[in-house]
């Protein structure tokens, strides 16, 4: 997956860009250049059909610009424009954009029983909801302590080793196992952000903000997919889901954070 390995390049180049314009970040001209820097990889990935990764890139960029001191007026303005655009799309253009599996996956979260008839056929409806439905059953059947490592019905979940690894963990180790797994991941995210906050070099701060944002976004989206509160968009659970390029990218990110921590940190208090 080239887009996974490209995350490193994007985080590093965007961090250097922010570091070069940090005193002029809120000037419209410089902000426009930053948004162009962010938009190019997002559009390329979107054209390839990987909207899940495109969303992660957008969150990475937002976290890094926030860490660099982006004005709240731009943040609130962007949120408002996005909300209005989404509401307008749903209200007036749903008949034009409401085609294809990506759109059906969104509608499957809103109306999983197809009461509004969004699916053109029963076969498409069953194919769309099957993965999340089986994942939810596997996750819920684990109870508090799970069914054991080789017990339960998790084998019936498509891609249980990848996007739905959390359903496998919930089935095998239960609610307690999921809490342990997510607790370790969130501890890593917090440590990454704290390392960035302690960095005496703003470049290190921006790098840690991007890496922390990427981890947090992937965790949140993957958990949402497994709980059927977000559509399936192909976002893996960091360090647990299968995938060579994804795991390689994650370990490189950890190495960058450790480099910032080792060479250029200060005490937060005192």
List where the protein language model places each region.
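Long extracytoplasmic/lumenal interhelical loops at the membrane interface
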Residues: 133-176
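Hydrophobic alpha-helical transmembrane segments of multi-pass inner membrane proteins, especially
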Residues: 2-124, 167-227, 252-256, 270
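A juxtamembrane structural motif centered on a specific transmembrane helix
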Residues: 218-270
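Short hydrophobic "helix-edge" motifs at membrane interfaces and signal-peptide entry regions
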Residues: 39-41, 136, 231-232
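Short gly/pro-enriched beta-turn/loop segments at secondary-structure junctions
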Residues: 101, 130-134
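Glycine/serine-rich anion-binding loops at beta->alpha junctions
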Residues: 2-6, 47-49, 53, 143, ...
């Amino acid at each position: 997956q080239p887009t996974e390995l490209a995350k490193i390049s994007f985080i590093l180049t965007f961090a250097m860009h922010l570091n070069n314009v940090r005193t002029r970040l809120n000037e419209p001209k410089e902000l426009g250049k930053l948004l162009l820097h962010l938009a190019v990889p997002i559009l390329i990935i979107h054209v390839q059909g990987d909207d899940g990764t495109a969303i992660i890139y957008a969150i990475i960029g937002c976290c890094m610009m926030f860490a660099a001191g982006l004005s709240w007026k731009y943040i609130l303005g962007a949120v408002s424009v996005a909300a209005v655009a989404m509401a307008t799309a749903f209200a007036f253009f749903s008949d034009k954009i409401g085609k294809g599996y990506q759109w059906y996956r969104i509608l499957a979260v809103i109306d999983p029983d197809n009461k509004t008839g969004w699916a053109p056929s029963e076969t498409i409806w069953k194919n769309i909801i099957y993965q999340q439905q089986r994942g939810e059953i596997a996750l819920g059947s684990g109870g508090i302590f799970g069914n054991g490592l080789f017990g339960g019905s998790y084998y019936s979940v498509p891609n249980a080793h990848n996007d739905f690894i959390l359903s496998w963990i919930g089935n095998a180790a239960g609610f307690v196992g999921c809490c342990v797994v997510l607790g370790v991941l969130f501890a890593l995210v917090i440590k990454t952000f704290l390392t960035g906050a302690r960095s005496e070099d703003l470049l290190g701060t921006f790098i840690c903000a991007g890496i922390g944002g990427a981890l947090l976004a992937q965790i949140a989206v993957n958990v949402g997919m497994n709980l059927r509160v977000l559509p399936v968009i192909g976002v893996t659970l960091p360090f647990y889901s299968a995938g060579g390029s994804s795991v390689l990218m994650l370990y490189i990110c950890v190495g960058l954070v450790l480099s910032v921590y080792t060479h250029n940190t200060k005490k937060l208090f005192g």
